[in-house]
A protein has these predicted regions:
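Glycine-enriched, solvent-exposed interface loops adjoining structured elements
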Residues: 1-211
Length: 211
């Protein structure tokens, strides 16, 4: 949906298509907040439309900060690291598994580099890796009142979820807690279904290859 369509659909949900109660500005604000809510609550696997890449980032001793790389990934969403030095995808490792990297069979090598994120810094092993491409999740672009004709950046399957959260916000502003809670529960239930499904389908192991 475009922002215009989302605004119109939200007006129908709120029983206010003429915008006599909820202004375009209030609905646009609610949509913007809701897009971020969806991005923050869903697994990265559903957010490929928000993926960006920055090429040829130089590392110092295998480390570079988000700010140094010129990126602002939403909730630390690094989805892949490509080792340009050795032409290999890094295996992404969660911080809870870092202790296991002390095992020589699991530590990063030039043929099997590993990467992890800690305190807004990207760490790559072996530290001889000098150049990487970083794939990350960016924030959705806010709509601006009076210029909402662009397509929503999120996957089309998530647009109704955005509207559920936006509807909940606006009913709450209108002092209708029951209707707000109903819309919010609909959104949370769908988030749970989607995340539970992804947990079943995603690869297992101490790390997964980027991309």
């Amino acid at each position: 949906m475009t922002g215009t369509e989302m605004n119109s659909n939200l007006g129908l949900r709120l029983e206010d298509p003429a915008q006599s109660v909820f202004t375009e500005a209030s609905k646009v604000d609610a949509i913007n907040i809701s897009m971020r809510t969806v991005v923050n609550m869903l697994d990265n696997g559903y957010l490929t439309e928000m993926e960006r890449v920055v090429d040829d980032v130089a590392l110092t001793d295998g480390v570079e900060s988000f700010s140094g790389a010129g990126i602002t990934p939403i909730r630390g969403g690094i989805t892949g690291i490509y080792d340009e030095t050795n032409d290999k995808w890094c295996t992404m490792v969660e911080t809870k598994d870092l202790k296991r990297l002390e095992n020589s069979y699991l530590s990063g090598t030039t043929s099997n580099p590993v990467a992890y994120v800690f305190r807004e810094k990207i760490h790559v092993k072996p530290t001889s890796v000098a150049l990487v491409d970083i794939w990350y999740l960016t924030e959705p672009t806010d709509y601006v009142v009076g210029a909402i004709s662009a397509e929503c950046e999120l996957n089309p399957a998530l647009h109704e979820l955005v509207l559920d959260f936006a509807e909940a916000q606006l009913w709450r502003m209108d002092a209708k807690p029951d209707r707000a809670q109903s819309a919010y529960n609909n959104a949370l239930n769908l988030v749970k279904v989607l995340n539970d499904r992804y947990q079943v389908e995603k690869p297992e192991g101490i790390g997964t290859k980027g991309r």
